[in-house]
Amino acid sequence: MVAKLFVLVACIALSHAAMVRRDAPPANTLLQDIEKHAAEIHKTFSEQLNSIANSKNTQEVNKAIKDGSDSVLQQLSALSSSLQSAMTDANAKAKTALEQARQNLEKTAEDLRKSHPDVERQAGELRTKLQAAVQNTAQEVQKLAKEVASNVEETNEKLAPKLKEAYENFSKHVEEVQKKVHEAASKQ
């Protein structure tokens, strides 16, 4: 009887010792968080831009939108550069997705640059293009996160943190632009 009990305890101890516990969250969760955050930023940014469309202080709003578009443009370039450097560490499938995202971001940045010169005259159009630039960036990040998540086993471990860092920098600047535009619209 004691021998059977000893064997049972030994088997239980052996099975618990063989279990592997992972402390770090899987990369899949990290990319899902980025995707969710991109959707939230786009929603908030769109709501704020729509709410200031009727502001009485048009000069301040136009200046804030112009400055904001400059800032978003710089961040789009930085995000594109980060994607370029991440491509060197990625595998073939991830490289294709990263290259496509980078090209789409560069196209979005170019569209925003083209609409920049006559801010006073084209404030509404610039606001729309700025909103579209943020939306396109959020969509590209979401699409990229899905692509990388579908190839998690093949994706290099270095890729997810680089993507997250680049996107966090972009989202911080978008939030700063939001604040500045909102402050300009709030001034009476």
From Swiss-Prot:
Expressed in fat body and secreted in hemolymph. Also expressed in ovary and testis at lower levels. Residues 1-17 form the signal peptide. One of its GO terms (biological process) is lipid transport. The keyword tRNA-binding does not apply. InterPro entries: ApoLp-III (IPR010009). One of its GO terms (cellular component) is extracellular region. CDD domains: ApoLp-III_like (cd13769). It holds the Pfam family ApoLp-III. Residues 18-22 form a propeptide. Keywords: Cleavage on pair of basic residues, Lipid transport, Secreted, Signal, Transport. One of its GO terms (molecular function) is lipid binding. It is found in: Secreted. Belongs to the insect apolipophorin-3 family. Assists in the loading of diacylglycerol, generated from triacylglycerol stores in the fat body through the action of adipokinetic hormone, into lipophorin, the hemolymph lipoprotein. It increases the lipid carrying capacity of lipophorin by covering the expanding hydrophobic surface resulting from diacylglycerol uptake. It thus plays a critical role in the transport of lipids during flight in several species of insects. Equilibrium between a soluble monomer and a bound lipoprotein form. Apolipophorin-3 associates with lipophorin during lipid loading until each particle contains 9 or 14 molecules of apolipophorin-3. This is Apolipophorin-3. It comes from Spodoptera litura.
